[in-house]
Amino acid sequence: MLANSASVRILIKGGKVVNDDCTHEADVYIENGIIQQVGRELMIPGGAKVIDATGKLVIPGGIDTSTHFHQTFMNATCVDDFYHGTKAALVGGTTMIIGHVLPDKETSLVEAYEKCRALADPKVCCDYALHVGITWWAPKVKAEMETLVREKGVNSFQMFMTYKDLYMLRDSELYQVFHACRDFGAIPRVHAENGELVAEGAKEALDLGITGPEGIEISHPEELEAEATHRVITIANRTHCPIYLVNVSSISAGDVIAAAKMQGKVVLAETTNAHATLTGLHYYHQDWSHAAAYVTVPPLRLDTNTSTYLMSLLANDTLNIVASDHRPFTTKQKAMGKEDFTKIPHGVSGVQDRMSVVWERGVVGGKMDENRFVAVTSSNAAKILNLYPRKGRIIPGADADVVVWDPEATKTISASTQVQGGDFNLYENMRCHGVPLVTISRGRVVYENGVFMCAEGTGKFCPLRSFPDIVYKKLVQREKTLKVRGVDRTPYLGDVAVVVNPGKKEMGTPLADTPTRPVTRHGGMRDLHESSFSLSGSQIDDHVPKRASARILAPPGGRSSGIW
């Protein structure tokens, strides 16, 4: 808790409180960083700051489940550190972010986590937590996973089926990681693409002389995402472990997820605001820097129906969450791949624009109502991360992470006015309805009417508890009722075949009535004197009884009888 948060009292008056399951008119009173009262005609002490929310919505602060602040990736470091990244989040209406720790192969997960904490703690402006990447597998990794879950407040691990020779895990390794996640009550997050075929596709594209950003789209077709999605759901199901798919980008992958949920498999899924609102046509732009700015993986899809389809999947709960996957690079950094698209750093911005873009395309576009908007931008994340209802809901006792949202106000997005890093904005000149007027983080007003007022380091790390109910409750019950058992039967007491010279292919002993063929000499000649042929006319099968011969009187085709 902030040192002076106890002295901060806020009354949000006259607005409509929106949770994921209901909307109602109510005032909200905040004190000591906690929502104290929600209702009408509240009895509150004097000295409270009053915020007029008449005609506005009062919603839970957004939770962005995928950000990459201060991360080095593909030889480039993201332009946003934890201060500038969380500042942009708050300006956009997001009050909590989840960052990523990606250890190099053969390095310690715990050490990488501690290094990231040391970078983040003095910088963050809002609450945060961390996913930890599993980029290699060994017994030591499992032991460190347990340490992170039991002692460090981590309840999710990120894996990749792509990025061959960098982060990619084999199916057998995923199987082992899922077993560990199930045992520790953690959530396995997987980026699903067929890494082997992606690598081959990239080689083929380069061999054809394709070096520009369009090579990303060509070498990452959606069928490779769909195949990997089906495969990893199967692996998770075999280990009785939940699975969380990230960066879902295609209609095909969405259909695989929908089918798995219909079958009762515990599958959670997340897309990004970029995939749910943009298309891959940008990769074919004549301006190389424009095309490169959109390079992310999986790529944006050429099918113009994809983004609206993904938004529909968010609306019907096939997809649970929309994240930003914020990892911006400058044009200069992207230019490291100007002669080879495989060297363009993968990453786009979006932490500041996520809430407004989803409101515009989701709510204004008629795909979802304000309750579902709250679900996909905040409440579902809180439930999955085991933070609900402390976060993701406006009720007494919850953390005072609150946004006063104006559904009628508009803004035009531009790189020239953005707070987030980078010299490009994917949504340049996009006009959005839905604007955060006031952002309250941990009980303090940090953004109001265009003015940011929060110092770095005022955020806090939020430890995440294992075994979240929304993820594990069904699986725990299934383990009790569907436990695999062996069959209780009478032991077999008969003879058992003995294997001679194991490892060598043994020829079986021929039966008595099986003709044997003499050994062929070198050069292909047979010893005729060793043949089974006999001048007496006797044959090897003469002892087998023969049927009596019968003369067939009918002509070919059968006997016919005349009419006359």
From Swiss-Prot:
Key word Cytoplasm present: yes
Modified-residue entries (Phosphothreonine), positions: T509, T514
Coiled coil: none
One of the record's GO molecular function terms: hydrolase activity, acting on carbon-nitrogen (but not peptide) bonds, in cyclic amides
Modified residues (Omega-N-methylarginine): R559
Gene3D superfamilies: Metal-dependent hydrolases, Urease, subunit C, domain 1
Gene Ontology BP, a term: negative regulation of dendrite morphogenesis
Pfam families hit by this protein: Amidohydro_1
InterPro entries: Amidohydro-rel, Hydantoinase/dihydroPyrase, Metal-dep_hydrolase_composite, Metal_Hydrolase, Metallo-dep_Hydrolases_sf
UniProt key word Cytoplasm: yes
Subcellular location(s) of the protein: Cytoplasm
Tissue: Highly expressed in embryonic and early postnatal brain and spinal cord.
Residues where Phosphoserine is found: S532, S538
Keyword set, alphabetical order: Cytoplasm, Methylation, Phosphoprotein
A cellular-component GO term for this protein: neuronal cell body
Function noted in UniProt: Involved in the negative regulation of dendrite outgrowth.
Subunit (UniProt): Homotetramer, and heterotetramer with other DPYS-like proteins. Interacts with DPYSL2, DPYSL3 and DPYSL4. Interacts with MAP2 and TUBB3.
NCBIfam families membership: D-hydantoinase
Family to which the UniProt record says this protein belongs: Belongs to the metallo-dependent hydrolases superfamily. Hydantoinase/dihydropyrimidinase family.
Protein name as it appears in the record: Dihydropyrimidinase-related protein 5
UniProt source species: Rattus norvegicus
